[in-house]
Amino acid sequence: MKTILCAILLLLTSTANASTMLLWSCKLLDGHTIDDVKAINSAWVDYVNELTDYRAQSYVLEAIASDDMTSFRYIDVFENPIHWGQIRSKMEAGDFDKFEAQFNNATQCDAASLYEAEES
C-alpha cells in the first residue's frame, strides 16, 4: 500500500508543473493588423478564464524578421489536458462562435499542434 501511495504521489508531483500548450501558425488577412489580432485574442482569453476555475494564458508571437511579415503564432497555455478538454468541449458546443468569426475574418491559421510542456 505504501508503494502505491508513493507512486501516486510521485506521479502527481511530476505533472504539477506540466501545462498543455496549443501552438497555432497563422497569417494576417488583408486589411487587418497584428493589433486587431491581439484585441480579439485578449477578449478570447478573458472569456476562457470566466468559464472554469483553471486559468489560461495566451501569447501572440509577432515576427520581427521573417520572409513573410504577415505570419505570426499563437501559444495558448492551459493548466492541464483536462482544462484544454473543458474549453474544447465548449468550443464544440458553439460557445466560442463569436470569437471564431472574428479570428476567421482577420486571420488564416493553417496548422495547430498540441503539446504537453514541463519546466526543465
For each feature predicted by the language model, list its residue ranges.
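Positively charged n-region of N-terminal signal peptides that target proteins for export
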Residues: M1-I4
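Conserved active-site beta-strand-loop modules that form the wall/rim of enzyme catalytic pockets
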Residues: A7
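Short S/T/G/P-rich N-terminal loop/turn motif that feeds into the first structured element of a domain
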Residues: L10, S14-G94, N105-S120
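Non-heme di-metal
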Residues: D97-E100
